Amino acid sequence: MPTDAEITFADHAGRLYARRYGMAPMAGRLLGYLAICDPRQQSIAELADALLASRSAIANAANSLDTLGLIRRSRAAGERMDRIQIDMNAPRSTGFDVTEYQEQADLAREGLALLADAPPERKAVLLEMAAFADFLVARLPELEKDWKAHREALRAAGELPDTQQHR
């Protein structure tokens, strides 16, 4: 069972993710707990027990996080249940998923097409949305490359464990 401090950390994560990203608090609590739990892979039942929540609440939170690409589900041979863990190698979990910004740019351009004959002031928000999204689409791949090089340097220096070894 987790300690009171670990539950408090999960609660803090729940509030942060609810406030900053509009997630359900349980999804944020689940992310927080998955960041600190041992072992890293947990079943729905284990997570429900640890977080003092129903299995359905955990399953719903896990489905939300899975849809967002923040967790990975796995199942060992012969097991009848999934095990869940944070997937730090997925582009969405690290913030490097450019498709989100491509979709935002496309949506802004769709709006701009509707306002083709409108004055520039009316199009200003959509023009800036498209420009910002295009900027991120262009810059994120290089930033991701820089992050991966930095992460490898931290691992080589022993300052960051290799999470690939702990799957």
Regions found by a protein language model. Name each.
Residues 117-167:
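C-terminal regulatory/oligomerization modules of transcriptional regulators
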Residues 46-49:
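A short acidic, leucine-rich amphipathic alpha-helix
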Residues 20-21, 35-40:
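Short helix-capping/hinge SLiMs at alpha-helix to coil transitions
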Residues 91-137:
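Amphipathic alpha-helical dimerization/coiled-coil segments
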